[in-house]
Structures are given as structure tokens and as C-alpha cells.
Amino acid sequence: MKLSEIQKVLDAEVLCGNNLLQREIRSCFACDLISEMLLYVTPDTLVITSLTNIHIVHTARVMDAVGVVFVGGKKPDAAAIMTSEMSDIPLLTTNHLIFECCGRLFVNGLKPNKKTTDSADVCG
């Protein structure tokens, strides 16, 4: 599914990265914990979150995520948007909450991120 299709499905506003809306999204991951994003986000994944700080953009960049959707009408500050633009990470915002975003995307064919780990990997 292309990011432009996701924008329509989620009634989302593009905050930056209009030129990147033709990116192909293979899966999505919804979370508000950066530590879980670091464990589970794989390349070509769309991150859905209500966190708006600059750390989300840095995490998305490190994990090779293809974009970030902020839910609940939230928007990051100018520094996060500027960092995202320099990193070629599209940012979108929607008034829908996380649960509804995930449901809409799933119904429209986008699959959840399938990376898993067991407790032995996490705990050492």
C-alpha cells in the first residue's frame, strides 16, 4: 500500500514529505513506547503513535521506518518536522485514535509488523 493511499484511508494531513507519498508501505506498527519500537519496527514499516517528540523521528530514522503517523490530531514541534524533512521521513497527522487507525489500515490490506522476539532475546 502506498503512503498516499494511507493518507486517504486515515483522513490524514501531510506535515512533511509530500514528495515521498509514493513510498510503498509493507506493514505498520502502533506503539507509544520507544523501547518497543526499537525491538519490533523493521524497515519499510509505518509507525503509528501519539508521541510527538523529536525522539520519535530519530527512532524512525534508526529503524528505517518509512513514515510516522501521529494520532489524535497531535502534531510534532518545528524541530521534529525539520529533522524529519532532513531525514526523508514523511510525517502525517490524523484525528483518529490508534485503534481506529490500525483497524482502517488492516481492513484496507495493510498487515501488522511481524517481527517478534522471545523473552530470552529480550532478557539476555
State where each predicted segment sits.
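Feature captures the catalytic cores and cofactor-binding loops of soluble hydro-lyases/lyases
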Residues: 22-23, 27, 31-46, 51-115
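A contiguous, well-structured "functional interface" segment within a domain
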Residues: 1, 60, 120
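N-terminal, charge-rich interaction modules
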Residues: 1-18
